[in-house]
Amino acid sequence: MDLDQWISKVKDGQHLSEDELQLLCEYVKEILIEESNVQPVNSPVTVCGDIHGQFHDLMKLFQTGGHVPETNYIFMGDFVDRGYNSLEVFTILLLLKARHPANITLLRGNHESRQLTQVYGFYDECQRKYGNANAWRYCTDVFDYLTLSAIIDGTVLCVHGGLSPDVRTIDQIRLIERNCEIPHEGPFCDLMWSDPEDIETWAVSPRGAGWLFGSRVTTEFNHINNLDLVCRAHQLVQEGLKYMFQDKGLVTVWSAPNYCYRCGNVASILSFNDNMEREVKFFTETEENNQMRGPRTGVPYFL
């Protein structure tokens, strides 16, 4: 595998061959299987939210935050679906993981799922670009190996969605069997699907999966686990980044600018330096994505 050549190829807008993609997926699975459900990461590191197939904007993200391996990254899932270039997004992230495994951490999001990708675009995109479903199969097999969360210097937990009534301690996340399709309920599901809300404890989620969780729940979780902050993605934020609750114990990071080529939002990434001091960097859509505006199917954004 000539990873550097493949990286250049994908950045130039070409696809790997089906055989090359299969080789890459198998290689990355061997790296991911060694990672913990709560993968320890050292600062300095930059945390990113949903990308959703917006490849040109991902390239702008790297221009904004720095390139791997000079900058370390945690991507909090939802690499695919909705945008037109899910294949390129996931391929380049896998290539960077293969080339610099210690410098990039890839978390699973609710869209890293066979079920959702058959509805929201990734399956159809693979069919269109390869002429069959093999590429989709190779990629969705990798989904099952992606880790569930990361913890920065023991004090900041990164997870795609949010908290679970079944998870009081970080150790309980470590015990989850993750090598499977995302279940429809339970702690694994909740970590992928839950959302913070201006309530005290728990409420039913309008998404039909996960929970709404409130300020008291978040404060208690952070206290029990000696955390300063929970970082998560999963929800569009017009201003790119949003702290929740009076103690600002949780932050939503959103990294897909002008989401779905029509939402008009800015994107952000959240950097932690060696002293865990935070810096937010904002960016807007690229010209390439600007040209992609057009009629979109009426799929609710919050899934």
UniProtKB/Swiss-Prot annotation:
Cofactors demanded by this protein: Zn(2+)
Source organism of this protein record: Arabidopsis thaliana (Mouse-ear cress)
Matching InterPro entries: Calcineurin-like_PHP_ApaH, Metallo-depent_PP-like, PPA2-like, Ser/Thr-sp_prot-phosphatase
Protein name listed in UniProt: Phytochrome-associated serine/threonine-protein phosphatase 1
Lineage: Eukaryota, Viridiplantae, Streptophyta, Embryophyta, Tracheophyta
Principal place of residence: cytoplasm
Expressed in which tissues: Mostly expressed in flowers. Also detected to a lower extent in stems and leaves. Expressed in roots.
Reactions catalysed: O-phospho-L-seryl-[protein] + H2O = L-seryl-[protein] + phosphate; O-phospho-L-threonyl-[protein] + H2O = L-threonyl-[protein] + phosphate
Cofactor binding summary note: Binds 2 zinc ions per subunit.
Functional summary from the UniProt entry: Catalytic subunit of protein phosphatase 6 (PP6). Dephosphorylates phosphorylated phytochromes, with a preference toward Pfr forms. Plays a major role in the photoperiodic control of flowering time in long days by modulating phytochrome signals in flowering time control. Involved in the regulation of polar auxin transport in roots. Dephosphorylates directly the auxin efflux carriers PIN1 and PIN2, thus promoting their proper polar localization in root cell plasma membrane.
Record gene name: FYPP1
